[in-house]
From Swiss-Prot:
PROSITE patterns: COMPLEX1_ND1_1, COMPLEX1_ND1_2. It is found in: Plastid, Chloroplast thylakoid membrane. Belongs to the complex I subunit 1 family. This is NAD(P)H-quinone oxidoreductase subunit 1, chloroplastic. NCBIfam families: PRK06076.1-2. It catalyses: a plastoquinone + NADH + (n+1) H(+)(in) = a plastoquinol + NAD(+) + n H(+)(out); a plastoquinone + NADPH + (n+1) H(+)(in) = a plastoquinol + NADP(+) + n H(+)(out). GO terms for molecular function: NADH dehydrogenase activity; oxidoreductase activity, acting on NAD(P)H, quinone or similar compound as acceptor; quinone binding. Pfam families: NADHdh. The chain crosses the membrane at residues 27-47, 98-118, 127-147, 248-268, 300-320, 336-356. InterPro entries: NADH_UbQ_OxRdtase_su1/FPO (IPR001694), NADH_UbQ_OxRdtase_su1_CS (IPR018086).
Length: 363
């Protein structure tokens, strides 16, 4: 029997090409997953380093300086240490709720990144209800905190969980009303459409100038949702030891630690998207019309410019929130609830009515 070697070679080359196609397909399937995860991880490490450096400057002391140049690897060293810590469980607590709580808190925050546009056509899910999806997802996180506090079987943990739930409900409503006002101005609930609506007039087209009252309410509500000083009542050290985190150690405690900074980064990015023009360069079009659309140039250059502009605006808000944490005293629980229900809620309602009236009269 005579075997045609050319046919065998053709079959082998075809099988190799098919296997290469499968390998490339698998790689391209994993790239959209690992790219946001790596970016978010690096972002959290940078935020932790910035907070330590800024707080050291405010308190006139030396910040982290040993782990890496300027102490930039200190957060990574602390995270590595937490990975090897023992994971303790409360003897009389509900271990299922105790273990599920941190996962619910961090997963709900991670899902919020799916609707954030980091650049022109650079968003994981451009949904028509993007901002409402973020509000719905973020409202799940306090459930995880309440489960953690209840499952710990500790009075301090349970009080912290109850405070977290009450605080979230109090400030979620004004925040939602501010988002509704922005949606009325943009005629859309999509985060991409909201950014595009602000790009018509450059710097002066930002919703910051069209909604100054809503911006102030959104800023305060975002800080309260992130449980940052002066709104860190759920984990007040002087009153509740560490709040709902009291019984946690090891990787579970690390998840709560990471979740707080992830939530802060999400809030900063949504301030950028809703009020600061998103990825747009925002140079006044009267003076330099060529640069006004520079970040919409297709390719790697335009994508890089859009990401850089978005992150630069977000880190400006981060600087404000970090400075606020290390300069203002903590509020009492009654003051916090009164601020949300008696002050921010009526203001946000009035802002929504004014926005609705102006939109109706402009028709």
């Amino acid at each position: 029997m005579i075997i045609d070697t050319t046919e065998v070679q053709a079959i082998n080359s075809f099988s190799r090409s098919e296997s290469l196609k499968e390998a490339y397909g698998l790689i391209w399937l994993l790239v959209p997953i690992f790219t946001p995860v790596s970016g978010i991880t690096i972002g959290v490490l940078v935020i932790v380093w910035l907070e330590r450096e800024i707080s050291a400057g405010i308190q006139q002391r030396i910040g982290p300086e040993y782990a890496g140049p300027l102490g930039i690897l200190q957060a990574l060293a602390d995270g590595t240490k937490l990975l090897f810590k023992e994971d303790l469980l409360p003897s009389r607590g509900d271990t299922r709720l105790f273990s599920i709580g941190p996962s619910i808190a961090i997963i709900s925050i991670l899902l919020s990144y799916s609707v954030i546009p980091f650049g022109y056509r650079l968003v994981l899910a451009d949904l028509s209800i993007g901002v409402f999806l973020w509000i719905a997802i973020s409202s799940i996180a306090p459930i995880g905190l309440l489960m953690s506090g209840y499952g710990s079987n500790n009075k301090y943990s349970f009080s912290g969980g109850l405070r977290a739930a009450a605080q979230s409900i109090s400030y979620e409503i004004p925040l939602t009303l501010c988002v509704l006002s922005i949606s009325l101005l943009s005629n859309s609930l999509s985060t991409v459409d909201i950014v595009e609506a602000q790009s018509k007039y450059g710097f002066w087209g930002w919703n910051l100038w069209r909604q100054p009252i809503g911006f102030a309410v959104f800023l305060i509500s975002s800080l309260a949702e992130c449980e940052r000083l002066p709104f860190d009542l759920p984990e007040a050290e002087e009153e509740l030891v560490a709040g709902y985190q009291t019984e946690y150690s090891g990787i579970k405690f690390g998840l709560f630690y990471v979740a707080s900074y992830l939530n802060l980064l999400v809030s900063s990015l949504f301030v950028t998207v809703l009020y600061l023009g998103g990825w747009n360069l925002s140079i006044p079009y009267i003076f330099i019309p060529e640069l006004f659309e520079i970040n919409k140039v297709s390719g790697v250059f335009g994508t890089t410019i859009g990401i850089f502009i978005t992150l630069a605006k977000a880190y400006l808000f981060l600087f404000i929130s970090i400075t606020t944490r290390w300069t203002l005293p903590r509020m009492r629980m009654d003051q916090l609830l009164n601020l949300g229900w008696k002050f921010l809620l009526p203001i946000s309602l009035g802002n929504l009515l004014l926005t609705t009236s102006s939109q109706l009269f402009s028709l």
